[in-house]
Regions:
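Oxidoreductase and adenylate-handling cofactor-binding alpha/beta cores
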Residues: 98-117, 163-170, 296-309, 345-349, ...
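A conserved regulatory-domain signal marking ACT and ACT-like small-molecule sensing domains
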Residues: 315-397
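Rossmann-like dinucleotide-binding domain for NAD(H)/NADP(H)
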Residues: 231-324, 333-335, 368, 372, ...
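An N-terminal-biased, well-structured beta-alpha scaffold segment characteristic
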Residues: 7-89, 222-228, 234, 245, ...
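Rossmann-like adenosine-cofactor binding region
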Residues: 8-9, 53-55, 177-269, 285
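Phosphate-binding beta-alpha-beta segment of Rossmann-like dinucleotide-binding domains, i.e.
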Residues: 90-148, 312-314
């Protein structure tokens, strides 16, 4: 059953942080905000990697902002049903991840890791400088210039990776049937666009995956897709662990079909595999990235709490609105079903309310309506709106 809530406009908002959030981001909050240790009384939550799926979400909670791109740790459907808007910060960590992907390409092309480990193992050996000249050939590799790189997924990170690899002299192929206009404009014109991932599999020496984890993409790198690839291909995964089937990649590494698998998500299986370069989830772990993510997350929360503006939500439609100049603003999170606007306006007109401006946006099963009106919102008005079937949360600003 849907959980509904009536929320009056606040002048003081309570923020709960579930992980360490950059101070630079937290300083964006002004004197109208204070931090709380109690999740039950929070108006908004800032989170990075903490698992929220088993947490009890309080009736006060209006928003959750993930300081990062992935939201697998947040119960999106539950939040939508409770009228809690979930935000992410796409692109804020894109440069950090891009740089690590390029590093991963170089680590896979040349046995830098093996060479470093050899030095550590022999650092106390007498005459190591002469031994280096004798052994360095064991760690020889290849240059990436002139090699073919396939980028699957041309979002904020994928575009940066493709452009950077092109500048390094690689022949870059990109595939993304859902590329946005913004990202298409940002993509180098020298990147070769292909329509199917199969073309990438058959063509490229290096393949890097930058897609979200969902049913359609889970284990997309598997025995069948690997079978289409070149012998000695290098696969890079800086998106989500489950995009790659561990058992299939292990067999491909053992047979030599896959030369190296570079992953930012080591687990019990991949950490022990030969041929795997496992990085301990460092993709977004830079000071700059953490600052950028925190600032973006805080701004998203502030805009929603103070104006009702939604940007970069993952469970409700984006609906960017300016600060209202009317007497009041009513925001309604509701199911995306017929006649809802008619029902809202009927209630408002019964209280002799004049609607100065109306915005309605929808996304899948959910919708968001914003009414700027010429009178103060009363408890009775909120209650009447809340009683409409399909309404999830009513708020006045």
């Amino acid at each position: 059953m849907s959980i509904r809530k009536l929320v009056r406009g606040n002048t003081m908002y309570r923020i709960k942080t579930l992980n360490k959030i950059s101070d630079i981001g937290l300083k964006v909050f002004n004197e109208n905000y204070r931090f709380t240790e109690e999740l039950s009384e929070a108006d908004a939550v800032l989170v990075r990697s903490a698992d929220m799926k088993s947490l009890e979400l309080g009736d006060n909670l209006l928003a959750i902002a993930r300081a990062g791109a992935g939201v697998n740790n947040i119960p999106l459907d539950k939040c939508a049903e409770q009228g809690i808007v979930v935000f992410s910060t796409p692109g804020a960590n894109a440069n950090a991840v891009k740089e690590l992907v390029i590093a991963g390409l170089l680590l896979a092309a040349r046995d830098i890791v093996g060479g470093i480990n050899w030095v550590q193992d022999n650092k106390e050996t007498e005459g190591i400088s002469k031994l280096v000249e004798k052994e360095k050939g064991s760690f020889a590799g290849n240059e990436i210039e002139g090699k073919k790189l396939g980028v699957i997924g041309l979002g904020a990170i994928g575009v940066l990776v493709a452009n950077a690899a092109k500048r390094l002299g690689m022949e870059v192929y990109g595939c993304d049937p859902y590329i946005s206009v913004e990202h298409a404009w940002s993509l180098s014109r020298d990147v070769i666009h292909v329509k199917t991932v199969e073309e990438i599999y058959r063509t490229c020496d290096y393949i890097t995956v930058h897609v979200p984890l969902m049913d359609a993409t889970k284990h997309m790198i598997n025995a069948d897709s690997i079978g289409l690839m070149k012998d000695g291909v290098v696969i890079l995964n800086f998106s989500r662990d489950a995009l790659v089937n561990d058992e299939d990649i292990e067999k491909a590494l053992a047979s030599g079909k896959v030369k190296k698998y570079v992953t930012d998500f080591p687990n019990e299986k991949t950490a022990e595999m030969n041929g795997v370069i496992a990085i301990p989830h460092l993709g977004a772990s830079t000071e700059e990235s953490e600052d950028n993510c925190a600032v973006m997350a805080v701004k998203e929360v502030v805009d929603y709490l103070e104006k009702g503006s939604i940007k970069n939500s993952v469970n409700y439609p984006n609906c960017e609105v300016a600060k209202h100049t009317s007497v009041s603003r009513i925001t309604i999170l509701h199911k995306n079903i017929p006649s809802m606007i008619t029902k809202f306006t009927t209630v408002l007109s019964s209280y002799n309310v004049n609607i100065e401006e109306l915005v309605n946006k929808s996304r899948g099963d959910y919708a968001y309506s914003v009414f700027d009106i010429d009178t103060t919102v009363t408890d009775e008005m909120r209650k009447a709106l809340n009683e409409i079937e399909g309404v999830l949360k009513v708020r006045s600003i």
